[in-house]
Amino acid sequence: MNRPSDVPFNAPAVERGMGFFETVLLVGRRAVLWEPHLARLYGTLRRFGFPEPDLPSLETSARTAADEAALPPREERGLRLAWIATGPDLEQPASWRLDVTVRPIPESTLARRTGSRAVTLRADLRRDTPDVKSTSYFAAVAGLRIARRAGGDEGLFTAPDGSYLEGTSTSLIAWNGGTPARAPSGALPSVTAAAFLEGGEDDVPLTAALLRRGALLCGSLTLAVPVVALDGAPCTVPEAMTVRIRDFNRRLLSDPQLGTML
């Protein structure tokens, strides 16, 4: 397997952020929500008509990466699947390359699991194509930097009307009195959030007032976590939300139905 150091400096992936990726939670050899992650990756490529990685080769690469990592059964890592453009002709499969790597979960992500201190991002900072999981990641990188400089651990993008959309690397859900709600549009279709919601959700504008009455973030490595503060002001953390988060995270880490053995 080629390594990132082999990518030419003038590759579309480097110069233009041309590529797609998925980050999968790996618990031992168990890839959490593996099939939904693959469905999102291949669905995006088919939607735009880009060449696709050979699925058996991808699965073999993932198993090889898991072999090399040799994780104990309960140890967690991030499994990164990256399909990046290294050649100039995007119509040619030979211009694309698959990289599969196992990485430590960032300490900042692990710290967020105890409760997120979210920061509202400036209105002019937004993703170029928010419903696509691409490597064009300026807004996310800049947004997280802004949040950290403000004393937070996650930045929240907003819509033109001021309502909230999602985090830089997480999905945003309002507890909404026990009927969880997401933004109607303008956010990535999150694999982890979909598993948490199980099809039961409302689509409503996520206002600051609504979030302060109870909200959570979902991400493949973050898991589900309560938002404990927004722009420095404490948020309510309803007990029922806490219970559901705890049960969901337990299932993510241990339920065979929510993972695939590599």
Task: Say what each PLM segment does.
Residues 1-56, 60-64, 91-262:
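Helix-start/capping segments and mature chain N-termini
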Residues 59-89:
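Short, acidic/charged, Gly/Pro-enriched secondary-structure junctions
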